[in-house]
Every structure is written in structure tokens, then in C-alpha cells.
Amino acid sequence: MNKNKREKEFYSVDVGDSTFTVLKRYQNLRPIGSGAQGIVCSAYDHNLERNVAIKKLSRPFQNQTHAKRAYRELVLMKCVNHKNIIGLLNVFTPQKTLEEFQDVYLVMELMDANLCQVIQMELDHERLSYLLYQMLCGTKHLHSAGIIHRDLKPSNIVVKSDCTLKILDFGLARTAATGLLMTPYVVTRYYRAPEVILGMGYQANVDVWSVGCIMAEMVRGSVLFPGSDHIDQWNKVIEQLGTPSQEFMMKLNQSVRTYVENRPRYTGYSFEKLFPDVLFPADSEHNKLKASQARDLLSKMLVIDASKRISVDEALQHPYINVWYDPAEVEAPPPLIIDKQLDEREHTVEEWKELIFKEVLDWEERMKNGVIRGQPSPIGAAVINGSPQPSSSSSINDVSSMSTEPTVASDTDSSLEASAGPLSCCR
């Protein structure tokens, strides 16, 4: 494509404190979120005739870390296609050559709210269970390709008014190609698993701990382990769950074990005391979902010793979750990750830049030739043992509405603006 023709396809518009240079098919840009990795705005796509979210990556070539993260996010989003993971609709850059290349734009599905907002609402058992089921389905799909998310948190999970849930932001994900033990990585502290806090390395069920923390927050309406720093986070965990056994201590390296063993010992609290019945909605007559089942699931996910913690597969079979079980959703074909050494690769900024530019051009070429994967279909009427899933028209527990802007969560826990539009899956 010649320079003049390409330039005519784009226009520039100020969005907040940033300038977006986007394809003319995208109109009515409006800021909805920002964070360390990018700025997100909503827009109307005249080609698809739908609202979308456009994320402009923030200074992707500032240094090797930023460049590698941008490459990882783009590659993983291109590979993954599941109804519970945010769909990538388009990728583009206004620059026409590698020498000029500096901006990357990702176009994604637009959702109604993130889980931070849902946590402030009252949920009946059907909705709580169904949201968790989708969270686990999306996580399992990533795990099936050896991808560990590592950064699951309420602001990285988005929902629509019909209770559709999707996981997003893969810049912190990594592949598990080199073995079981992996290095610690800074994720949002409150949802960080003990094995990460203690530098033990981790396996796939590190994400299960995060799901457990999120579930606990949905039940309690507040963060379960609100640590003020790395050490305080561990203290908050053992104060509530109790000091782990000597068997667990022996798995720690010597310096960490010495520190942990010298901390005050806590007996912890029973899950009945941590999550009393009063925190839960009334038991569901519709499908027999009960507070006791939800509490049992929490007790299996929030286990300090990862070797004794429930797996994603086991969580999906739990009575509180498996009422929604659909093999087509749970056993969806794993994404094909072509670059098996995605996280082990090291390059200069210029090399990462060239790799990203090639990925963008590849997407543009496939779009031009019509060779682009279909997007995840709406959840529609999933069934619960033959009964329809909770929908926006459900009368269960007199659904009321919450006002939120349509939004895609940013990679921080802030910058989401509220205003109109019901989130009617919650009451």
C-alpha cells in the first residue's frame, strides 16, 4: 500500500491526554480506562456495526521489558479464541515502515463493567456460581495451552449485562514450557498466591488461588487478604488460614524458612467463621446451590500448600460449579501457541520491535485476504441441568440495575468511569 493511500485511511483525535491515530472505520472515540500498559477508549466500528474497545499500548518500545510484554500480549491474544476470554477484533499501526513504527493499537470486544463493580452488588447463588464457572472455563482454556495468567484480579475480568464473563490482559501471562518451577513475578498483591510470595516457584494452580481470593471478595464485599506490602501479605494469609505445617516449611529455601518459622504462629479460623452463612444469599431452590457448597469450594481453593490445592479441572467438577458444565465450553480445543519459547526469548528493543511489526503486518494481511478467525460467540442461553442460565430478563431475586459505562478494564485497578447502562445480571 502506498504512503498516500495508507495515510488517507487514518485520522487523529485527542483522547484524554493522548492522541489516537486510528482507522477511519472507528468513530466516536471516548476514554474509558488507562494504566501502565495502555490507554483504552470506546469507539463505534462502522465495518462491524458495533461498539468496540481500542487499546493503545503505552510506549511499547521504551525498553526491553515493555517491548517483550507488548509482543507477548499480542501473540497470545492472536492465538486464543474462547468465549470466556476477551476477543481480539483487530490490530493495526498507522506507521507504514519498520523505521517509523512506534504505535500499536489492539481492538477488542467492549464489555459493560469489570468485576470490581460487580463485587459491590448483591449476587444470588446462580449468578455467583455462573460467573465463577466462566472464570474457571477461561482459565482452563489458557492452561490447556500451557499459559498461566498470573494476574487474575477483579479489574482484569469483565462482564456484560447478560452475565457473560471474559478474562483479559495477557501482558503478564507466561507460558510454562520449561518445567514446573518458575520465578516470582509482581502481580497485584492481594491475589498473589503463597508460593509466589515466598519465592517457591509455581504451577498452573497459582491461578486457582487468585480465583479463590476473587470469590471470597465477591462473597464478603471486601478484599480477603489486604496486605500493605510483601511481608504483610503473608501475615494476612496466615492470620486467617493459620501457619502452615512443617511439611510445607521444608519446601522453602533456608533463608525464607527461617523467616517464616520465626513469625508468630497462628491457628487461623475455620471457613465457617471466615465465611458464615449470613454472608451468602439464601439457598437456591432452583438448582440446590447452597452456602455450604460455596464455602467448601473456597476451602479447597484457598489452600496455602499448592500441592494440596484444588486444580481448575477439579474446581469445574465441584457441586457448586458443575451445574453449568458444558463440554463444549470446558473442553474447547486448546489455542495453538506457535512460539513455544515465548517467555524464554531475549531480544534487543529493536529486535522485539521488528517481531511486533511482523505480527501486525501478518494480521493486516490475513484481514485483507479474509483469513481471520471467527470471534467467540455470545454465551446466549447456556443451560443448568436443562434449565436456562440467568439472563437479564430473569426474575430471580428481583434483579435491579447498576449504572456503569461500557468498559474494558485496564491493567491497573483504577481509571474506570461510571454512568449509564444496567448490569442486570446482578441484583
UniProtKB/Swiss-Prot annotation:
GO terms for molecular function: ATP binding; MAP kinase activity; protein serine kinase activity; protein serine/threonine kinase activity. Transmembrane segments: none annotated. ATP binds at residues 33-40, 55. SMART domains: S_TKc. Gene3D superfamilies: Phosphorylase Kinase, domain 1, Transferase(Phosphotransferase) domain 1. Residues 387-403 have a biased composition (Low complexity). A motif (TXY) lies at residues 183-185. Residues 372-427 are annotated as: Disordered. Expressed at high levels in the ovary and at lower levels in brain, gill, heart, spleen, liver, kidney, muscle, bladder and gut. The modification Phosphothreonine is found at residue 183. Pfam families: Pkinase (PF00069). Keywords: ATP-binding, Biological rhythms, Kinase, Nucleotide-binding, Phosphoprotein, Serine/threonine-protein kinase, Transferase. The active site is at 151 (proton acceptor). CDD domains: STKc_JNK. The modification Phosphotyrosine is found at residue 185. Its EC number is 2.7.11.24. GO terms for biological process: positive regulation of NLRP3 inflammasome complex assembly; rhythmic process. The TXY motif contains the threonine and tyrosine residues whose phosphorylation activates the MAP kinases. Responds to activation by environmental stress and pro-inflammatory cytokines by phosphorylating a number of transcription factors, primarily components of AP-1 such as c-Jun and ATF2 and thus regulates AP-1 transcriptional activity. May play a role in the regulation of the circadian clock. This is Mitogen-activated protein kinase 8B.
